[in-house]
Amino acid sequence: MPSRLRKTRKLRGHVSHGHGRIGKHRKHPGGRGNAGGMHHHRINFDKYHPGYFGKVGMRHYHLKRNQSFCPTVNLDKLWTLVSEQTRVNAAKNKTGVAPIIDVVRSGYYKVLGKGKLPKQPVIVKAKFFSRRAEEKIKGVGGACVLVA
């Protein structure tokens, strides 16, 4: 017959909670967690977790993990890296000095060529430029400056 209560609710008020008398349902008989993986739990670790212990291969000292780190930004997002005021001033005075956008200061290394640039010259500083990006920047009368 199904019961309305879970077993734990039924056992409320019974001191041992179904685990016998003194010290029968003991604390951590095999140790806590992964204890004894190389000793009393060896069979389990060998069977179900082969290769858990030990080392393989050689260590690479002074390994540079982020050699290929190169965050990119597209041309259509280029003007979002400078303030609104700079953008407005550059649009107003067409013959004046071209604004400088340093993408490295904004955390990007490479400029990619997706999107269109407004028809006003701009000087872009970056570590890398894609071919299309360089063509488009020079197409609006701007310049690409490589920085280390």
Swiss-Prot record:
UniProtKB keywords: Acetylation, Cytoplasm, Hydroxylation, Phosphoprotein, Ribonucleoprotein, Ribosomal protein
Assembly mode: Component of the large ribosomal subunit.
Species of origin: Mus musculus
Any single Gene Ontology cellular-component annotation: cytosol
Modification (3S)-3-hydroxyhistidine occurs at: H39
HAMAP family hit by this protein: Ribosomal_uL15 (MF_01341)
Segments of skewed composition (Basic residues): 1-30
A GO biological process held by the record: translation at postsynapse
Functional note: Component of the large ribosomal subunit. The ribosome is a large ribonucleoprotein complex responsible for the synthesis of proteins in the cell.
Broad class of the protein's primary localization: cytoplasm
Protein name: Large ribosomal subunit protein uL15
PTM notes: Hydroxylated on His-39 by MINA.
